[in-house]
A protein has these predicted regions:
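Extracytoplasmic
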Residues: 77-81, 101, 111, 132, ...
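Surface-exposed, charged secondary-structure patches
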Residues: 57-103, 231-233
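Short solvent-exposed beta->alpha transition segments
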Residues: 18-28, 32-79
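Acidic/His/Gly-enriched intrinsically disordered linker/tail segments
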Residues: 211-218, 238-239, 257-385
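Bacterial signal peptide processing site
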Residues: 12-17
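Juxtacatalytic substrate-recognition/specificity segment
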Residues: 139-262, 353-356
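Short beta-strand edge/turn micro-motifs at domain boundaries
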Residues: 94-134
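Bacterial N-terminal signal peptides
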Residues: 2-11
């Protein structure tokens, strides 16, 4: 009986393992053919592997690479579910593959071939832009803008903002970064939340965020600026530019922004570059903090990371951003633009938060944290009272 089982196993999968391996190999081959169709812009070949709508949604995206790695397969007759890792690079922008988890449903066709019936984000992964519909693409001198449910004219407006932001950031920070940005413009707040894999309520009123690869681990081979079109639409022309320049600053400073960097510095520095050259006065750019100072409620300490939580009360959140901006503005006023950049880099060079700010203040600015805080409070009185 054992000999018979061994013989039949080599032919029909006695015990199930050879058959399972065969199915995995067949599905991986299917995904390889589908990936080749994407890269070769071959809609006909893609349609033999999966729904053509999925191909049409992403066909305008300029891709340098696109591949799947099957990690698990669970078959139940003519239907199977699978987990896979999708890796891709946007041509000219991503220096390494973006990798995200995908959950696939497959079915056997009448001729016994596997077919991708659905391809969705894995349980803990955010959506990709093409999961939300057909992607339109506009390329700029320093930017790539991709949107869903947006007119080409509106994407061109974002391109103009991004193309202005990149050289503005380089003028203040320097040129030791990629000097280009990818901007994603979904159709709504819900679309933004889908890309981030978070509840929409977390980003209501937030005009844009910068993240590592959308839906990925956050250890970013490339950053994405993701716009909340609902909040962005209510901004004036200066506000729209400030937001895009702020987010572009996060892209530029990514390599020097570490766990040692407090949010008052990373957000304050991004706002400082964002407002630079706009002509906005402190009372105009920091209205909530200005009201607090004028009411005698002068902050006793620099904003904490907790103060920047999206769940914070709107006024408190605004004061945190404004307080960080005023701290960076003070450094520029008293020590200069170059020293502000050196201070930012010095803080980020530390391995951990403890002592990072204090060490950088002593080495770059020549003051203690206590002295800096008192100078900042005096600066708030002078500028906002």
């Amino acid at each position: 009986m054992l000999a018979l089982c061994l013989l039949l196993g080599s032919l029909v999968g006695c015990g199930g393992q050879p058959a399972a391996n065969s199915a995995k190999a067949a599905v991986q081959s299917l995904l390889d053919r589908q990936s080749a169709a994407v890269l070769h812009h071959d809609g006909t070949a893609y349609a033999r592997t999966g729904a053509r709508t999925a191909y049409e949604n992403l066909s305008a995206v300029p891709l340098a690479s696109w591949s799947y790695r099957l990690t698990s397969l669970h078959r139940a007759g003519a239907i199977a579910t699978a987990d896979a890792q999708l890796s891709y690079r946007v041509k000219g922008y991503d220096t390494a593959p973006v990798t995200v988890g995908r959950a696939l449903t497959l079915r056997l066709t009448a001729d016994g071939q596997w077919y991708v019936a659905s391809d969705k984000p894995a349980k803990k992964s955010g959506q990709q832009l093409w999961d939300q519909g057909k992607v339109s693409v506009v390329k700029g001198a320093h930017s790539l803008v991709m949107g869903v449910g947006r007119s080409v004219d509106s994407l061109r407006d974002f391109r103009a903002l991004a193309d202005h932001a990149v050289p503005a950031v380089s003028a203040a920070w320097g040129t030791d970064w990629t000097r280009h940005v990818v901007v994603l413009v979904p159709g709504s707040l819900d679309g933004m939340a889908g890309l981030l894999g978070s509840p929409a309520a977390s980003y209501r009123g937030i005009a844009a965020v910068t993240t590592g690869e959308a839906g990925g681990s956050g250890s970013a081979p490339a950053d994405r600026i993701i716009v909340n079109p609902d909040a962005y639409a209510v901004l004036g022309s200066v506000g729209k530019q400030v937001v895009l320049t702020h987010e572009t600053t996060h892209v530029a400073t990514r390599a020097h922004t570490t766990p040692a960097t407090p949010l008052w510095l990373s957000e304050g520095y991004a706002d400082w570059i964002g407002y630079r050259g706009t002509g906005r006065t402190p009372t105009q750019a920091a209205p909530e903090l200005s009201r607090a100072v004028q009411d005698g409620d002068l902050p006793t300490a620099l904003p904490t990371d907790k103060d920047f939580g999206f769940s914070s009360e709107a006024t408190e959140l605004a004061r945190a951003y404004e307080g960080g901006w005023m701290a960076c503005r003070m450094i520029q006023d008293r020590w200069g633009v170059d020293q502000l950049g050196k201070f930012y880099r010095a803080v980020g060079s530390h391995q951990k938060r403890a002592g990072a700010v204090e060490g950088a203040m002593k080495n770059v600015l020549g003051v203690t944290l206590e002295e800096f805080t008192e100078q900042w409070r005096d600066y708030l009185r002078a500028q906002l009272a």
